[in-house]
Amino acid sequence: ELEALKNDIVTFAKIRASYAEVGQAGDYMDNFFSIPVYGGGFYQLTPLMYPINGNTAYTPHYVIYDPNLKPQNTKSYEFGADISLWDNIINLSYTYSRQNVKDQIFEVPLSGSTGAQSMLTNGGKLHTNTHEFTVDFNPIRTKNVDWNFGFNFTKMLNMVDELAPGVESITLGGYVTPQVRASAGEEFPVIYGSTYKRDENGNIMVDENGLPLKGEDGVIGKVSPDFMLGFNTSLRVWKFKLSAVFDWKQGGQMYSRTTGLGDYYGTSIRTADREGTIIFDGVKADGSKNDIEITGPIAQQTYYTR
């Protein structure tokens, strides 16, 4: 304690810092060369149904392991400050942290000529920056009544700095477009899929039927929110206590296949007026504004598949 800093306003103040370094070996769920085949058909891509006469079959596992695989390494830095004012009526806290992940373990896709689908290897370098700010306010604090408010703000940015040599993105989930991927130079994770073809001004281009043209596959959205807010309050009167919590996430996208199929089959609310006309907001090949009407349920079904 420093006597020179004692006063009636600042009750407590602290500056903190920490450093940690952790290694992680990764998950080895399939550490065998071959796996038994049960059933058949579409899932096994074979017309045969196993077991046959009580005999099962084995197929090579689609994942191979890098013989030079090493643990991924995470270095964490954290800096922060805490301050309490007016006998802890107001408490403020701020924390900045950064995580650097090196040798991130991923399943990196391989060419079919290798006889495997992917290889578990050290395939990336990532970093995370986090800012967190909290405020606690306790305006009423008596023996029989206590009322407290809390507020917090969090902003987190995950970035993929690099992946394995020759690999631009790694699929984390999804069978067809769109997929969730880790892409070099992008936030982690991102939604990767078909994009619209655009002109030099960023306008979506349409074909001679008024339907949007498909562009190259790429990043079409990010999963993580821009920031998160939280609010909580609790009121205690004698032995009774009432609490409330409010959470808010701003930003971030998601893809709903259910909604897409509802649009395609005409069962969603926004396709209720499918007997009318649609003019897609875009430009034609000559650069003029699109004025081609899409009419009828069949044409609109084609529109929703784009």
What is the role of each PLM region?
Residues E1-S183, L235-W238:
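Extracellular/periplasmic, surface-exposed regions of secreted and cell-surface proteins
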Residues G54-Y62, N100-K125, L157-S224, N232, ...:
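Surface-exposed, extracytoplasmic segments of Gram-negative outer-membrane nutrient-acquisition systems
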